[in-house]
């Protein structure tokens, strides 16, 4: 049967009341498919992109079942463990769980790197219902015996493919091995490379498979375009795009941490206020940058792929790929930052001649050719070369020149965001 209302799940009263207060009535597709089996005790293998409502899909069943338990967790234990690849995503998950709980007697603890261990150790010493953690810091605290996982009956691995990309799979396997053998597990991933499939096989028992966005599927309401520009011309082209009134809230993606800093510095020189966010930034600096972006004090955020996981900001008008990603799947994650909650959005890719192979990988994954964009003149013969197969090649130096002048320039919410 198709689920059309959260009321059909029979969730605990505090959860239902919190959803009603927030105006959340209709589950997203992944919530409609995943919540009921988990309430029945089944494991879940979820294939879904970011922004589809995954947090509620695994969070509501855990909260519902914990509320039915008597007593409190024992010291240095937790009842549920949620692993996330990045600090930003972990913070976002905890925030959503608190909202869903609606003031019910649920305790949570964030276990993250980049901040003091002492406060985390004190909180864990009392015992908590739900630990939301990144693998590195959690491995340290478990190894130092500040937390036992053998009483955790629920475990969630969110964005498992990104954990693989970040080299966390070994730590994740070790942590999973310390969990209670009779546990309920869920694994969510946007893609399913062999290593993640192997992890799912060892973690899950006869799981229900739910799939919302098949691999390579992108959101139709996002306008996607590509501009072939020389590397040296990217700075001017980016400034020109950001000078348009339509570019009201923008995420610019750079491939490396150093590259993100360089882009933000160049934008500042061009009179455009921007903040950079990446893994080398301290947690409080990352939080300040995100707060400034959410509040509108800063309208341009420059990010790396890993740091962008967990950015939960509505109203993104543009995503700009200053650099093409090394992995085509990251393109799908990037552009998914815009076009959320029924709104439209634009995704613009600036492609240098030496990035053509990465562009072809993106087009193969998404099964579509990106439309040529930009208002600069572009010779008609350049387009076939631009999309040519590797053996055909493309003329060196082809592509548009930015017509942006030099000098300084002044440049309805739904539950699916959970």
Regions found by a protein language model. Give the residues of each.
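Arginine-glycine-rich low-complexity intrinsically disordered regions
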Residues: 117, 380-418
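Conserved helicase RecA-like core
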Residues: 1-382
């Amino acid at each position: 049967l198709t689920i059309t209302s959260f009321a059909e799940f029979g969730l605990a009263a505090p959860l239902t009341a919190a959803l009603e207060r927030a105006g959340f009535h209709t589950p997203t597709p992944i919530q409609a498919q995943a919540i009921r089996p988990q309430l029945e005790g089944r494991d879940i293998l979820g294939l879904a992109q970011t922004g589809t409502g995954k947090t509620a899909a695994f969070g509501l069943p855990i909260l519902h079942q914990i509320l039915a338990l008597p007593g409190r967790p024992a010291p240095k234990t937790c009842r549920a463990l949620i692993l996330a690849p990045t600090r930003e995503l972990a913070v976002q998950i905890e925030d959503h769980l608190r909202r869903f709980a609606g003031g019910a007697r649920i305790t949570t603890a964030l276990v993250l790197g980049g901040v003091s261990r002492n406060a985390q150790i004190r909180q864990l010493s009392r015992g908590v219902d739900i630990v939301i953690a990144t693998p590195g810091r959690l491995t340290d605290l478990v190894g130092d015996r500040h937390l036992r996982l053998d009483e955790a009956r629920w475990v969630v691995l969110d964005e498992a493919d990104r954990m693989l990309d970040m080299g966390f799979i070994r730590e994740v396997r070790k942590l999973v091995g310390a969990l209670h053998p009779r546990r309920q597990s869920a694994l969510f991933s946007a893609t399913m490379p062999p290593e993640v499939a192997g992890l799912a096989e060892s973690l899950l028992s006869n799981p229900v498979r739910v799939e919302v966005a098949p691999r390579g599927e992108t959101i139709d309401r996002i306008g996607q375009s590509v501009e072939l520009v020389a590397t040296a011309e990217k700075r001017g082209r980016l400034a020109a795009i950001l000078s348009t009134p339509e570019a009201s809230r923008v995420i610019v993606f750079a491939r490396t941490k150093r590259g993100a800093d360089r882009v933000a510095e160049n934008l500042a020189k061009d009179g455009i206020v921007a903040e950079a966010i990446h893994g080398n930034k301290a947690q409080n600096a990352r939080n300040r940058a995100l707060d400034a972006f959410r509040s509108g004090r800063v309208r341009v955020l420059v990010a790396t792929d890993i740091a962008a996981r967990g950015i939960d900001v509505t109203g993104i008008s543009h995503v700009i790929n200053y650099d093409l990603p090394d992995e085509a799947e990251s393109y799908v994650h990037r552009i998914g930052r815009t076009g959320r909650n029924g709104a439209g959005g634009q995704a613009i890719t600036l492609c240098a001649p030496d990035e053509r192979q990465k562009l072809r990988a993106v087009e193969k994954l998404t099964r579509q050719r990106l439309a040529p964009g930009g208002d600069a003149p572009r010779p008609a013969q350049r387009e076939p070369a631009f999309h040519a197969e590797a053996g055909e090649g493309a003329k060196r130096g082809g592509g548009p020149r930015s017509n942006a002048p030099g000098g300084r320039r002044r440049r309805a919410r739904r539950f699916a965001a959970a």
